[in-house]
């Protein structure tokens, strides 16, 4: 009989082994209740909301919005067997750090810190809209911390006309409520879905700093790069991602990308179809298991 192998499996293998448990834990109660951790690294502190236990999954929010947008989705994913980590972007919640020179590289470093301190190996990164830029750069710069990447509501490489203007109105509390709702319904919510909850939750005071942060590094440096497999979840009614651009990323990265369209969802997606998103992520992770 050969001697027992006492060497621990690599972290990517451990992720796979833990992911196998998802088939048993789907719908089961999360093993750990919701709580917060404050990670400190020199002048930086990252406020992280934690749900559940299991392989690490990091949720990254959209432009000018914070991680509390994911409350419902985080609970569903935790109940499906993940340890869900939600680092608040700098300037939101209790997350702090230098804002001068903030860019996607710095934001990705905060994600890597979260995975290093609270993960149990490389994590699944789930980025919503602007958050998917952070996830992509984290995968590029910190591949050892990233097992896979899920894109929620990733816009087309070049924004279609009108959507950025609608965002500017919808996110501005000084604008008339009727105009904001019109912008939300046009650019974020599918027909029949209630846009009113998103009148709240914006951080317009951070608009300029995050707009500047999103420009560095330029998209050309990271759009065609992926160390990890990618699930590109698109809303069927998302004006930021016209049907003609469905395979835009897959055409560049090939078989690393799986494209799936979520019905009755637009750019907001997360509050519109949390159950469909959860199901898609869990099924895709199962498919990654060798």
Where are these regions (language model features)?
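Conserved HGGG/HGGXW glycine-rich cap/lid loop of the alpha/beta-hydrolase fold
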Residues: 49-94
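Active-site loop/oxyanion-hole signature of alpha/beta-hydrolase fold enzymes
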Residues: 86-126
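Flexible "cap/lid" loop of the alpha/beta hydrolase fold
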Residues: 133-140, 149-175
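Conserved alpha/beta-hydrolase catalytic His-Asp/Glu region
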Residues: 161, 171-226
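Short beta-strand/loop motif that positions the catalytic acidic residue
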Residues: 226, 232-234
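Acidic catalytic loop of the alpha/beta-hydrolase fold
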Residues: 237-241, 267-268
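Short alpha-helix in the alpha/beta-hydrolase fold that links the catalytic acid
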Residues: 242-251
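Catalytic active-site module of serine/aspartate enzymes centered on a nucleophile-bearing elbow/loop
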Residues: 256-290
